[in-house]
Amino acid sequence: MCDDDAGALVVDNGSGMCKAGFAGDDAPRAVFPSIVGRPRHQGVMVGMGQKDSYVGDEAQSKRGILTLKYPIEHGIITNWDDMEKIWHHTFYNELRVAPEEHPILLTEAPLNPKANREKMTQIMFETFNCPAMYVAIQAVLSLYASGRTTGIVLDSGDGVSHTVPIYEGYALPHAILRLDLAGRDLTDYLMKILTERGYSFTTTAEREIVRDIKEKLCYVALDFEQEMQTAAASTSLEKSYELPDGQVITIGNERFRCPEALFQPSFLGMESCGIHETVYNSIMKCDVDIRKDLYANTVLSGGTTMYPGIADRMQKEITALAPSTIKIKIIAPPERKYSVWIGGSILASLSTFQQMWISKQEYDESGPGIVHRKCF
């Protein structure tokens, strides 16, 4: 393991889940929620060795007694102390590696504040003493994972959605659009519309239950109005869900009303365009000669694109917006939940990429600002 490209680590820090593993693998070894939980109550059992904070799955399993916080909001790290805990947990508990022995590839959302990636760089080199690191744009990695160099990626996770047009491997920064509407907003919206049915979900722990309902039962309707009529006329769309305490709740039109907000953000009281229009607007900001290629290579990525029916609906909506002669193809790879990580794994194991790493030495000479020069 003396070679420099010895086992790079790939860490995709999402707003909702952290995906981590080794470059060259075909799937992340560790996938856990990006959550730090702190006890809500005073410990009374002396000698139990209670911790002052829990990370990831352990925080999730003890959520009843904890206040859960997500250190990444809308793709931007807002709480660095908690973020450090998550990285520490990733390296030492999940992957069981010493970060000072491996180059580390991190990911971030496009159009993030510059200070965000500088601070990431600083923590990697100064706190974890890693030998080399790199920060890659999430959507670009998703395109790599789909085996393309040209296309437009709609990457929608828990905290942020964005559309990134890429031509021959270059992201076109002027045409990147960002939409602060993603999985977490849909979870909150589902909490709200379930309240209308008389079910009350309020705490941070209950929000996780609603997220599970959303992931298991929601889908995107091809025709929203018609689906609403079907739901009103019969009970064919109703599904039941058993809560952890054994009580069973029934959900009907909420199943498709919740993800409909992706196409109609006005449901959430937002004035922005839906994801279909965002993709279209992003394509229209590109050079007229490459639009055809983008329409034909529209790649979905991220957990919020996992709803059944979303690809067909995108096809229908974008076809309605685009010129009638254009061929539109929506690519929704089955592994799209992890495609950012998979792309990172591919990138970090390319021989041509090895000269791209920012080394500890370069960092010591130039400081955190080096990240803007070396990473796209």
Curated annotation (Swiss-Prot):
- Which Pfam families did the record assign? Actin
Which GO terms fall under molecular function for this chain's record? Answer: ATP binding; hydrolase activity
Task: Give the primary localization class.
Answer: cytoplasm
Q: Which residues form the propeptide?
A: 1-2
Q: Gene3D superfamilies annotated for this entry?
A: 3.30.420.40, Actin, Chain A, domain 4 (3.90.640.10)
Q: Which reaction does it catalyse?
A: ATP + H2O = ADP + phosphate + H(+)
Modification type N-acetylaspartate: residues: 3
What does the entry list under GO cellular component? Answer: cytoplasm; cytoskeleton
Methionine sulfoxide is carried by which residues?
45, 48
Q: State the EC number(s).
A: 3.6.4.-
- Record-linked CDD domains: ASKHA_NBD_actin
Signal peptide (residue range): none
The compartments listed are: Cytoplasm, Cytoskeleton
UniProt keywords (A-Z) are: Acetylation, ATP-binding, Cytoplasm, Cytoskeleton, Hydrolase, Nucleotide-binding, Oxidation
Q: How is it modified after translation?
A: Oxidation of Met-45 to form methionine sulfoxide promotes actin filament depolymerization. Methionine sulfoxide is produced stereospecifically, but it is not known whether the (S)-S-oxide or the (R)-S-oxide is produced.
EC class, as a word, reads hydrolase
What function is annotated for this protein?
A: Actins are highly conserved proteins that are involved in various types of cell motility and are ubiquitously expressed in all eukaryotic cells.
The misc remark on file is: There are at least 5 different actin genes in this organism.
Question: According to its UniProt record, which protein family does this protein belong to?
Answer: Belongs to the actin family.
Report the protein name in the record.
Actin, muscle-type A2
